[in-house]
């Protein structure tokens, strides 16, 4: 029996809803997307604060449990940029990658990490828990691979000897920042229902 009969995911992305639902069964009976008419601006200054803002707002507006995530790429040589602005670093994935590679053209330190924070909010908007996942890697000088999205073609994962874009969705999920954060949320639900 699910711990939560239904919860809302603070996203309009049906693919993300399906991914989260797959990770969170059997603890959440049904996970639904935020209605298209509801937009939540990411106005906070950190991944944690943005995830909490989105989860709390969705919970209060919908009157039910809500889950939200915020994630992005933090490049060491760029002092953590693009960070919380990862999705707004350009108009398209190609433009974001082009800008990143241009800014790193003469940079030898290519270390970077993807960060994901997930927040679970009660129907009154209070935060029940946040979880975090990180995946360390390096920024390549040119894209590799056809899969994934965003910065995946230039994000090299040394432990896998491939970019995210060269991994299958299942392989990526096993090592990614979002996969780690979702696994920690699963562990939280397991403590509620031993």
UniProtKB/Swiss-Prot annotation:
InterPro entries listed in its UniProt record: dITP/XTP_pyrophosphatase, ITPase-like_fam, RdgB/HAM1
Residues given in the record as Mg(2+) binding sites: 70
Catalytic activity, EC: 3.6.1.66
CDD domains: HAM1
SUPFAM superfamilies the record matches: ITPase-like (SSF52972)
Catalytic activity: XTP + H2O = XMP + diphosphate + H(+); dITP + H2O = dIMP + diphosphate + H(+); ITP + H2O = IMP + diphosphate + H(+)
Cofactors that this protein relies on: Mg(2+)
Role of this protein: Pyrophosphatase that catalyzes the hydrolysis of nucleoside triphosphates to their monophosphate derivatives, with a high preference for the non-canonical purine nucleotides XTP (xanthosine triphosphate), dITP (deoxyinosine triphosphate) and ITP. Seems to function as a house-cleaning enzyme that removes non-canonical purine nucleotides from the nucleotide pool, thus preventing their incorporation into DNA/RNA and avoiding chromosomal lesions.
Assembly and binders: Homodimer.
This protein's name: dITP/XTP pyrophosphatase
The organism of origin for this protein: Thermosynechococcus vestitus (strain NIES-2133 / IAM M-273 / BP-1)
């Amino acid at each position: 029996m699910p711990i939560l009969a239904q919860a809302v995911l603070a996203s309009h992305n049906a693919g993300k809803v399906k991914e989260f639902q797959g990770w969170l069964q059997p603890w959440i009976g049904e996970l639904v997307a935020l209605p298209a008419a509801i937009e939540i601006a990411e106005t906070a200054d950190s991944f944690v604060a943005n995830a909490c803002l989105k989860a709390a707002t969705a919970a209060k507006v919908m009157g039910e449990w809500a889950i939200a995530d915020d994630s992005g790429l933090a490049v060491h040589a760029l002092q953590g940029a693009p960070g919380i602005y990862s999705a707004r670093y350009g108009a398209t994935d190609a433009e974001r990658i082009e800008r990143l590679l241009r800014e790193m053209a003469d940079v030898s330190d290519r270390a970077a990490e993807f960060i994901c924070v997930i927040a679970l909010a009660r129907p009154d908007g209070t935060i029940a828990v946040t979880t975090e996942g990180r995946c360390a890697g390096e920024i390549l000088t040119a894209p590799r691979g056809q899969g994934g999205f965003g910065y995946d073609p230039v994000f090299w994962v040394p432990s896998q000897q491939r970019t995210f874009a060269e991994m299958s969705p299942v392989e990526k999920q096993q090592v990614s920042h979002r996969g780690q954060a979702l696994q920690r949320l699963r562990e939280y639900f397991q403590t509620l229902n031993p």
